[in-house]
Amino acid sequence: MIATSRAVNMNKESKHKKAVAKPCRERQTSVTRAMRPAVARDPRRLSTSSSPSSSPMSAQRRLSREEIINEMEKEQDAIVVRLLREIETLKEENSRLKNQLHHPVPARRSSPFFEGESAILDDDDCNYGYTLDTPKLKLTDGASRHTVLPLTPKDSMTHISHSARRSSRNASISNGTSISDTIFPIETKIHSAPTTNRNLPSADLPHHTLLPRSLSGISSSDLTESGALLHDRRRRSSNYSLDGSNSLKADLMAKRFQTGSLK
């Protein structure tokens, strides 16, 4: 009985302790639960705690976006300006090239004295004659090569003299005469006679048709003396023939024996 009473008392004390301890826990939890929502739901604390932390971050974000947009606009403006300048330079170059195509620059400027004159080129003599008919360059053919043009300067006279020398040279070569005949045409005209008149005396020859202007007023005795001098000069130059053949020299010696000029 004693053991049972003690056990009952111990059980009662433990139950009483548990009952006393429970309301304290419940009071603490109720107080804490009542305090926590009041602190969390206070609008003043929410405004004071959240506004200073959120406003500078949003301001920084807005400023960075505006700066990026401004920088992009500046870059686009610079690109547009550069492209406009390139377009202007290309337009100027295009207009300059068009002007050069429509109005070509002359390669060389001619003197005003020869602007309205045309050059006539001779293939053999390379002598130039100028006429006043057309401003273009002309090349003459073989038929009109030796024609005399009106209003020709000094070069055309040299052209005529060269052509006369060329014709006399060709005639001397075809007849088998020496270079001395072409060098001294006056003495060949005076002392050379055709084949039919070789046996005639010198007095019967028609001197008036063969004498040049400078010898027209000279007597026959003077002519014979001058003819002898010319034949001496001709004798010195007769050693040179065109091709160095002995047949031409023999012909010349025969001519001199017939005319009686050989001493």
From Swiss-Prot:
One of its GO terms (cellular component) is cytoplasm. It is found in: Cytoplasm; Nucleus. The keyword Methyltransferase does not apply. Residues 46-61 have a biased composition (Low complexity). Keywords: Cytoplasm, Nucleus, Phosphoprotein. Coiled coil: none annotated. Residues 1-62, 149-176 are annotated as: Disordered. The modification Phosphoserine is found at residues 172, 192, 214, 238. Present with 2100 molecules/cell in log phase SD medium. May be a component of a protein phosphatase type 2A (PP2A) complex. Negatively regulates SIT4 phosphatase, a modulators of caffeine sensitivity. This is Protein phosphatase type 2A regulatory subunit RTS3. It comes from Saccharomyces cerevisiae (strain ATCC 204508 / S288c). The lineage of its organism: Eukaryota, Fungi, Dikarya, Ascomycota, Saccharomycotina. The gene is RTS3.
